[in-house]
């Protein structure tokens, strides 16, 4: 049984026997049909079948599932009956390292989904009256208008679970069947990544070390939304955070707190934008600046100017390839000679989902780069929410803008494209050769990123 079946459960049917009976018998009624009731069970219920048929006044059709699956479904189906529901949902989501929690009103019930590793995973179903209690509690926490249901609202809240503090960003919007609520979880000081987690080759690490050791210049991390740019940026900040430098960041918002670094959040009401904030920070005697994102002409111009006047500047930019970084900066009004003089490195990256170590299975021997390797396939278990995947790895290109590239500045776009494509393919080969990804995902990545599929594909 796939975990997605939680979406098909009729809560009125599932809860009809009560929590004590379903736990005792290791069963869960799923739905009623005209002449029968569908029941999932993890063990023989012959002795209890007659009782269940009497309660429902219908015949019982039994489907066998594993004990861990039935326990998981029972927990998710009866979740809404528990006390401290907000704390339970937040605790479980944080345990799964989820980035967002979605409460989605349907015609009859509320579906809860959580975003893990960039993918929304069905988490539970609760009844509307149970959701209204959650919604009211969250609105109070976020200083939102508890009576307003017709307009979108945004809020912030801070909670403490155990000995850890978490920052929540709250958003409601009216949809057809009620108010949808999304909670974004910011993990603050709980950040376990560093440069060693970035899946860089020895050669890439050497180039990155050169880039971060330079006293001034601009380093940009590029990629689409959700490609891990912020994680890479914070990992670098942890690496360069020393007692003898003044590091100041400007973020929207501050997602990870790092001791010893001065971090500033954008604030529209206080007129702190990327441009105005950067102007003020430059008066604070900074050695190193981190700008969450270069979005407009003024920020781009100031970032380049700062990097040319003795500061080290790190930032992200929304482009797909390293060569597009140059086009984007030029579009923002930065002169090409200033880009050449200021830019010392580009890190271009994507994320690819990795197989669950608990349940992945051997698939077959495949040939890659003139050698045979064992490839693996996704299966699915409770640990990975029955997706077959757990976690993500980055596929990166580290482009060090050295004198060779600066001399060839007239051909820089083609030069950078060739360098970055080659590095991404090497990263990708490492992941397939070490059993992190499937052959299908390997080939799909080549196609999606335009990495010469015909030349580099694995033929099954």
Task: Give the ranges of each region predicted by the language model.
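Long, charged amphipathic helices and adjacent flexible linkers at domain junctions
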Residues: 4-13, 77-83, 456-460
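Charged, low-hydrophobicity low-complexity segments
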Residues: 5, 54, 61-91, 95-100
């Amino acid at each position: 049984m796939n975990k997605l079946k939680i979406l098909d459960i009729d809560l009125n049917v599932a809860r009809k026997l009560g929590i004590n009976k379903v736990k005792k018998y290791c069963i869960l009624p799923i739905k009623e049909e005209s002449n029968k009731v569908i029941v999932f069970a993890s063990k023989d219920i012959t002795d209890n079948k007659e009782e269940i048929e009497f309660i429902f006044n219908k015949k019982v059709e039994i489907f066998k599932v594993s004990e861990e699956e039935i326990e998981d479904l029972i927990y998710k189906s009866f979740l809404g009956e528990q006390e401290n529901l907000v704390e339970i949902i937040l605790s479980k989501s944080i345990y799964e390292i989820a980035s967002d929690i979605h409460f989605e009103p349907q015609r009859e019930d509320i579906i809860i989904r959580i975003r893990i590793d960039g993918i929304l995973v069905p988490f539970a179903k609760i009844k509307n009256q149970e959701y209204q209690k959650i919604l009211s509690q969250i609105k109070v926490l976020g200083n939102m208008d508890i009576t307003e249901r017709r307009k979108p609202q945004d809020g912030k809240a801070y909670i403490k679970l155990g000995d850890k503090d978490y920052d929540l960003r709250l958003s409601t919007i009216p949809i057809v069947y009620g108010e949808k609520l999304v909670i974004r979880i910011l993990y603050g000081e709980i950040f376990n990544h560093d440069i060693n987690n970035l899946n860089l080759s020895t050669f890439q690490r050497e180039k990155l070390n050169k880039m971060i050791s330079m006293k001034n210049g601009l380093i940009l991390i590029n990629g689409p939304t959700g490609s891990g740019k912020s994680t890479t940026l914070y990992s670098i900040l942890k690496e360069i955070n020393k007692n003898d430098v003044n590091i100041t960041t400007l973020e929207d918002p501050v997602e990870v707190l790092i001791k010893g670094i001065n971090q500033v959040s954008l604030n529209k009401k206080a007129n702190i934008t990327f441009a105005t904030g950067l102007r003020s920070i430059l008066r604070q005697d900074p050695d190193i600046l981190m700008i969450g994102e270069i979005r407009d002409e003024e920020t781009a111009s100031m970032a380049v100017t700062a990097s040319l006047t003795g500061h080290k500047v790190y930032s992200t930019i929304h482009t797909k390839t390293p060569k597009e970084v140059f086009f984007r900066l030029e579009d923002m009004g930065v002169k090409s000679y200033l880009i050449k003089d200021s830019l010392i490195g580009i890190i271009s990256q994507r994320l690819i989902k990795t197989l669950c170590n608990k349940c992945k299975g051997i698939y077959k021997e495949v040939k890659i780069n003139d050698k045979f390797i064992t490839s693996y396939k996704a299966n699915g278990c409770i640990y990975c929410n029955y997706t077959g995947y757990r976690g993500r790895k980055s596929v990166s290109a580290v482009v060090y803008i050295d004198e060779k590239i600066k001399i060839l500045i007239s051909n820089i776009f083609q030069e950078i494209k060739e360098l970055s494509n080659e590095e991404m393919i090497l990263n990708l080969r490492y992941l397939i050769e070490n059993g992190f990804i499937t052959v299908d995902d390997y080939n799909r990545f080549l196609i999606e990123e335009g990495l010469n599929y015909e030349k580099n594909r694995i033929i099954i």
